[in-house]
């Protein structure tokens, strides 16, 4: 592990993102000339350059950059998602050589062996580091002698709900010390049976008493307990990104729209609507505001909140109580998964970016059989008040996924964004543990008039027509080779081929590959189906069919459950076919 002696000052930043301030190791006047921009696989506007700041960090989620340039990252040890890094779940990184790559990397905090799970949320305030760890928000004092804290953390808030589909707790701290924390929903749409076909919504949705909103606490006080009384805003399904406004007061949040409209309600929604509805959202969060979940979802094509099918909706026409809910200030293509947002307050990017929002889109799983989307960083200008211009929405950084946009096979999945004191943008990836640094090298006007607009939402990007066609980007490991797979006893080659189609969403719209990966090797949404030992089945065709048919209604040896038939409505023939296909895939898997 590299260690450096650092010269420090005693000054503290007075703004909300304050932290220990240390003088740079190299004076600004001595800054070396920029080296040639390396090719790291990203597509950026003219004049921008991306470098790999660090890699192999595990599963980095959100990150912050201190005034001295030290990058702090929270990682998530969610289990079953690849190798667990040694050391603590928190990471401090520093570039003392000014080559835009961290040469000092230190881990701290609890290790996975000590029960450390990490999380998503992280922030700086008054010279201290605030982090999410399991059901708590903790505070570490930062000293002048080291980039990592030496003492134990203090507990700011404890008892945050951990169960269900969305256990993370992103948060932000404003200039007044108000800590805003997301307590996301435990379910997809507050159904009586989560993610099951035609399951009605619970009325009233009791989940909203303790979930589905943003809560408010005091960042200066320790020993606070989670309480329904501290709710700040409601009707927010999953605000994975929260950012303080440029003036230090008030917050913006991203909202993950609900899933499985066609899977659960095929009489009301077709496959195309599954891929294009509902929108992902950017909210300007107001105290006491109700943003509609679970009763409503935002139909981006119509530009309004409409009544959800679980609560009497008719496929997008009825409004009901949604007419009185608060709409987003900007919206984005369905299922892109906005995992973080930051407001650009740096000075090095062209003027177009000042005061706007950079949003990290983790990437979709719920658009099969059409191409998955997201896996990028989008810039959304913010005008005065809540005004935004959709036409100015920009796909700022793309190419993270590499050759295949698939949750289990993407090269990188953006999970966090943060602005550095020098104006650079840092992007974290929780798939392969990479931190990217994006800086601007051109003149201030070079990129002002040229950008890649966000795609339209009235049709799935890249859709080629019928659901029987292979998705253009979804060429999975066995595409076109089902005929060469072995056939289970008592089954047929036609059944294996049908199972291939059902698994990849071309028939039946189950979209199993969305959770388990297009190659069945798993993702954070679903376990590896080619492992030598399965979590939920004995691996026989009969056992596989039973698990598909009945589901796994409570989490078992994995962070998430599985609804019966993936939440779709499969025929007995289709269930048996998927089981036959998985059995056939497993015969050639390593360890067998």
Please provide the spans of the model-predicted regions:
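Beta-propeller domain segments
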Residues: 21-43, 168, 185-227, 236-238, ...
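Periplasmic/extracellular electron-transfer cofactor-ligation site
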Residues: 42, 146-148, 223-226, 250, ...
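Residue-level detector of Asp-centered blade-edge/turn motifs that repeat once per structural unit
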Residues: 66-68, 124-126, 173-176, 243-248, ...
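Conserved beta-propeller blade signature
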Residues: 70-74, 128-131, 178-182, 250-254, ...
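Asp-box/WD-like beta-propeller blade repeats and closely related beta-sheet repeat scaffolds
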Residues: 104-125, 134-174, 201
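Gly/Gly-Pro-rich "capping" loops immediately C-terminal to redox-active cysteine motifs
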Residues: 107, 513-550, 561-569
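C-terminal capping alpha-helices of c-type cytochrome domains
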Residues: 423-425, 430-434, 440-444, 542, ...
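Electrostatic cytochrome c docking/interface patches
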Residues: 467-507, 592
């Amino acid at each position: 592990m590299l260690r450096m002696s650092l010269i420090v000052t005693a000054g503290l930043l007075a703004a909300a993102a304050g932290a220990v301030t240390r003088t740079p190791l190299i004076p600004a006047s001595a800054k070396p000339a920029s080296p040639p921009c390396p090719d790291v696989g990203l597509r950026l506007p003219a004049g921008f350059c991306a470098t790999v700041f660090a890699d192999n960090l595990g599963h980095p989620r959100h990150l912050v950059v201190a005034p001295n340039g030290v990058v702090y990252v929270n990682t998530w040890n969610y289990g079953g998602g690849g190798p667990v890094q040694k050391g603590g779940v928190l990471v401090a990184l520093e570039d003392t050589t000014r080559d835009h790559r961290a040469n000092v990397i230190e881990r701290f905090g609890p290790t996975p062996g000590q029960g450390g799970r990490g999380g998503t949320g992280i922030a700086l305030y008054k010279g201290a580091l605030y982090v999410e760890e399991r059901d708590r928000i903790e505070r570490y004092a930062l000293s002048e002698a080291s980039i990592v804290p030496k003492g134990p953390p203090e507990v700011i808030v404890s008892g945050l709900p951990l169960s269900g589909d969305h256990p993370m707790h992103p948060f932000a701290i404003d200039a007044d010390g108000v800590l805003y924390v997301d307590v996301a929903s435990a379910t997809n749409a507050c159904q009586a049976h989560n993610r099951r076909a035609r399951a009605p919504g619970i009325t009233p949705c009791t989940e909203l008493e303790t979930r589905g909103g943003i809560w408010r606490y005091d960042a200066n006080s320790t020993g606070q307990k989670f309480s329904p009384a501290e709710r700040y805003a409601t009707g927010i399904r999953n605000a994975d990104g929260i950012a303080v406004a440029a003036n230090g007061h008030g917050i913006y949040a991203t909202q993950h729209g609900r899933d499985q409209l066609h899977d659960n309600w095929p009489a009301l929604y077709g496959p195309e609507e599954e891929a294009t509805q509902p929108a992902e959202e950017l909210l300007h969060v107001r105290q006491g505001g109700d943003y509609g979940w679970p009763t409503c979802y935002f139909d981006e094509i119509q530009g309004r909140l409409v009544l959800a099918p679980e609560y009497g909706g008719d496929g997008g026409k009825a409004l009901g109580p949604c007419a009185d809910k608060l709409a987003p200030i900007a919206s984005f293509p369905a299922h892109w998964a906005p995992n973080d947002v930051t407001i650009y307050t740096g000075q090095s990017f062209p003027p177009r970016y000042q005061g706007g929002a950079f949003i990290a889109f983790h990437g979709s799983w719920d658009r099969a059989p059409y191409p998955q989307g997201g896996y990028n960083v989008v810039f959304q200008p913010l005008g005065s008040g809540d005004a935004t211009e959709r036409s100015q929405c920009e796909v700022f950084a793309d190419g993270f996924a590499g050759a295949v946009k698939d949750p289990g096979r993407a090269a990188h999945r953006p999970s966090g964004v943060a602005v550095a004191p020098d104006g650079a943008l840092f992007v974290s990836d929780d798939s392969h543990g990479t931190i990217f640094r994006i800086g601007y090298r051109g003149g201030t006007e070079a990129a002002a008039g040229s950008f890649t607009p966000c795609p339209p939402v009235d049709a799935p990007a890249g859709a080629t027509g019928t659901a029987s066609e292979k998705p253009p980007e979804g060429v999975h490991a066995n595409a076109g080779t089902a005929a060469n797979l072995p056939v289970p006893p008592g089954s047929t080659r036609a059944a294996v081929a049908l199972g291939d189609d059902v698994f990849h969403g071309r028939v039946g719209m189950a979209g199993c590959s969305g959770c388990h990966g297009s190659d069945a090797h798993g993702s954070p949404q679903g376990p590896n189906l080619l492992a030598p030992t399965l979590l939920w089945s004995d691996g026989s065709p009969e056992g596989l069919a039973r698990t598909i048919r009945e589901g796994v209604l409570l989490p078992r040896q994995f962070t998430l459950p599985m609804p019966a038939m993936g939440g779709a409505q499969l025929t007995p023939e289709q269930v048996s076919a998927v089981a036959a296909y998985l059995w056939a895939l497993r015969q050639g898997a390593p360890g067998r």
